[in-house]
Amino acid sequence: MKALHFGAGNIGRGFIGKLLADAGVGLTFADVNQTVLDALNARHSYQVRVVGEQEQIDTVSGVDAVNSTSEDVVTLIATVDLVTTAVGPVVLERIAPAIAKGLVLRKAQGNERPLNIIACENMVRGTSQLKTHVFNALEEGDKAWVESHIGFVDSAVDRIVPPSASAAHDPLEVTVETFSEWIVDKTQFKGELPTIAGMELTDNLMAFVERKLFTLNTGHAITAYLGKQAGHQTIRDAILDEKIRLVVRGAMEESGAVLIKRYGFDDAKHAAYIEKILSRFENPYLKDDVERVGRQPLRKLSAGDRLIKPLLGTLEYGLPHQNLVLGIAAAMHFRSEDDPQAQELAQLIADKGPQAALAQISGLDANSDVVASAVNAYNATA
């Protein structure tokens, strides 16, 4: 099997690329970072530090790389068996035209072998969104062929991959936690289902997408926002602060109550899942900066993301949400000179006030009780 992976960043190399290469898949990375591309093509290998109670260094080998803006990408899409991405939600739209061109070339060459495309992004149904962008770039006459020959497979991914401390010396070295989870929707594949160690197949993906979003992502974000407010530098420092831990655990329990109601997750198993997440945040070997985790607060406060979506679930089922509200208020306080969204958030609050700003960002009713609660919490910590 041959695969093209868009995104040779830390998550691409440390998570999806590593799983594919470890499974014996012939792997080519596509990226725009020339330093990384040159290093991959010079060495055809890189090292991954897997850190936990026992640290190990794994070597990923047999890889190469192409520039994602080059015609090489188009040619590869016409021949490979799998395309994956780890580029960030915003970049999916940018890579879609190249994917569309590659699919048209594949059709022109008469290659009718099934091709499956999997976006491995921190978003709900990311591949379905990528498919929309790809279809927008296709001519009408090509859409039916793509629909019948190309699988667009949604997935849920989970692995904490902070920036590597040694990246300044070696652009390829990456540090990851031991835990990883890659769950894919088996109902969306074309052709035979692949067998790749570390890839789990399910016919109930949304349950796992929301479990991860409402627990790992919700908890991670709230830890970062409360940690930043309290002057902590890392996620570990923040989660070891008992006041913060209480709110984070409470928020994950509130979002968990939504998951249990919606999908029938087992109470005890979900409680254990929350404990596992908290222990991952405590990992002393991951230097995960609160500012990195908190960046892009406008996206994280949007209706379909990690703070507002679980809150909407609590409103839907009439469940408690006071800790989620505290997390939302902390997100509204997030400031970073290096993050344009943090600056835009600050400007929006300055121009419109916290009530109208939160309503605009989140889609919540400005006059609702929950917005009033969030604004009160925001003002209480101003």
UniProtKB/Swiss-Prot annotation:
Reaction catalyzed: D-mannitol 1-phosphate + NAD(+) = beta-D-fructose 6-phosphate + NADH + H(+)
GO cellular component: cytosol
Residues spanning the membrane: none
An annotated GO BP: mannitol catabolic process
Keyword terms: NAD, Oxidoreductase
Gene3D superfamilies: N-(1-d-carboxylethyl)-l-norvaline Dehydrogenase, domain 2, NAD(P)-binding Rossmann-like Domain
Annotated Pfam families: Mannitol_dh, Mannitol_dh_C
EC number(s) from the headed UniProt entry: 1.1.1.17
Binding site for NAD(+): 3-14
Family: Belongs to the mannitol dehydrogenase family.
Annotated NCBIfam families: PRK02318.1-2 (NF002646), PRK02318.1-3 (NF002647), PRK02318.1-4 (NF002648), PRK02318.2-2 (NF002650), PRK02318.2-5 (NF002652)
UniProt name for this protein: Mannitol-1-phosphate 5-dehydrogenase
Gene transcribed to yield this protein: mtlD
